[in-house]
UniProtKB/Swiss-Prot annotation:
Binding partners and assembly: Microtubule inner protein component of sperm flagellar doublet microtubules. Interacts with PPP1CA.
BP terms from Gene Ontology: flagellated sperm motility
Localisation per UniProt entry: Cell projection, Cilium; Cytoplasm; Cytoplasm, Cytoskeleton, Flagellum axoneme
Name of the molecule in the record: Stabilizer of axonemal microtubules 4
Biased composition, class Polar residues, residue ranges: 207-222
Organism: Homo sapiens (Human)
Segments for region (Disordered): 93-126, 203-225, 316-335
């Protein structure tokens, strides 16, 4: 059983109230609307006095000529131009000269930005002389860049119309194309013997006729040193130096560190002796005949140890590139993984990507509970609320507001299917 609704104490503003609204659209009834509100209220139309800036102005009594016309006409004439705004003085209507203004004292006055103060509408003489030259006054050599009276043909302005430029600017020919009239010549019907033309034997051009044999490139095989390749004119140096790519067969010699080279580098550029005697020593290309007389020996003299056969080659040692490298350490993140190429970056910054079953993520073991993300932290938990009870809502409202709602809407107090719900006739 629901208890009786509290009616409350009658307050002064309830006595002054004109009652609740009968309009069901006015759902929210406030104390101000019930006490002072009137239906069809229309505000009075007033006059616009001014903005808030006007209150800071000093009271100024303007003196106009119409007010002083009867009492003091002389005072009105004196105060006629005193109260005039700066905008009305500066921005006046356009005044066109009627010819009654006096002529200026000097025709070369400096013109201002206003059109009414210009003495004449024509361009000044100084601007005219910059464009039109007077040769009688200055002479052809007085001004640099003075154009002659007749412009050369190449300097004349020519039209870009292709129809005008055809046939040497005589217009296009009849039944001919633009390309044919410009770039193709008409074939002559006369035979060649009438033109007195003769075709001789084919000769070499200027690139090969005046060329001489180069002593740097040409080297007869008889003058070549033993071990040096013979450079013939017909043999290309590019083809001999840049050979095609060949695949290894397995019988090549292993690379070893040359004796006499520096240990801190991996290059054998400073090699003075070649361990393999079967490989011919490299010799530079002779630049000239006179230069060959002062060249050193191409082959190094063998020492006594080499002649006795006591020169041995030691075991292979690491070069300068691998001396400073750390030892090969298998990565602790995945010891079973075969890391053939281990770099410093892979050793320090290993991959943090899960492998195997760990790579499945949330799908492993079924659907996992959703974790709160950054977007869902500030969102409240949404749930299905129960149907609002009108009686419970009326108990928490003001008594006057509750009576206003029940008088305006008789279906608000009880549910529609209740026996107590009786519509007012």
């Amino acid at each position: 059983m629901m208890g009786k609704l509290p009616l409350g104490v009658v307050s002064p503003y309830v006595k002054m109230s004109s009652g609740g609204y009968t309009d069901p659209l006015k759902f929210y009834a406030t104390s101000y609307c019930t006490a002072y509100g009137r239906e069809d209220f229309k505000p009075r139309v007033g006059s616009h006095v001014g903005t808030g800036y006007k209150s800071n102005f000093q009271p100024v009594v303007s003196c106009q000529a119409s007010l002083e016309a009867l009492d003091n006409p002389a005072r009105g004439e004196q105060a006629q131009d005193h109260f005039q705004s700066v905008a009305s003085q500066s921005y006046r209507p356009l005044e066109v000269p009627d010819g009654k203004h006096p002529l200026p004292w000097s025709m070369r006055q400096t013109s201002s930005g206003y059109g009414r103060e210009k003495p004449s509408a024509g361009p000044p003489t100084k601007e005219v002389r910059k464009v039109h030259f007077d040769t009688q006054e200055h002479g052809p050599q007085a001004i640099t860049g003075l154009e002659p009276r007749e412009v050369p043909l190449l300097h004349q302005q020519q039209g870009q119309d292709p129809l005008e430029r055809e046939n040497f600017r005589h217009g296009p020919r009849f039944m001919t194309s633009e390309y044919n009239s410009k770039y193709l010549r008409d074939p002559l019907d006369q035979p060649d013997f009438l033109q007195k033309k003769s075709i001789g034997a084919k000769e070499g051009s200027g690139f090969t006729k005046q060329s001489h044999q180069s002593p740097i490139v040409f080297q007869p095989p008889s003058q070549a040193l033993p071990g040096d390749p013979a450079l013939l004119p017909g043999q290309s140096v590019t083809k001999s130096d840049f050979l095609p790519k060949t695949h290894l067969h397995g019988d090549e010699f292993l690379p070893v560190l040359a004796r006499g080279s520096k240990r801190e580098t991996a290059f054998s550029r400073g090699n003075e002796r070649i361990l393999n005697p079967r490989v011919p020593p490299p010799c530079p290309e002779p630049s000239s005949v006179s230069h060959q007389q002062f060249q050193p020996l191409h082959r190094m003299q063998q020492t006594n140890v080499a002649l006795l056969g006591r020169e041995t080659v030691g075991k292979k040692e690491p070069t300068g590139f691998s001396l400073n490298n750390p030892m090969y350490v298998r990565s602790p993140c995945d010891p079973d993984r075969d890391q053939r190429y281990l770099t410093t970056y892979n050793q320090g910054y290993f991959e943090n990507i899960p492998k195997g079953l760990d790579q499945e993520g949330w799908t492993r073991g079924g659907i996992q509970p959703q974790m709160p993300g950054g977007y869902a932290l500030s969102q409240p938990v949404s749930c299905m609320e129960a149907t609002p009870n009108p009686m419970e809502s009326l108990r928490h409202l003001h008594p006057h507001v509750g009576r206003t709602l029940t008088s305006a809407d008789p279906f608000y107090q009880n549910t529609p299917h209740s026996s107590r719900c009786v519509a007012h006739s």
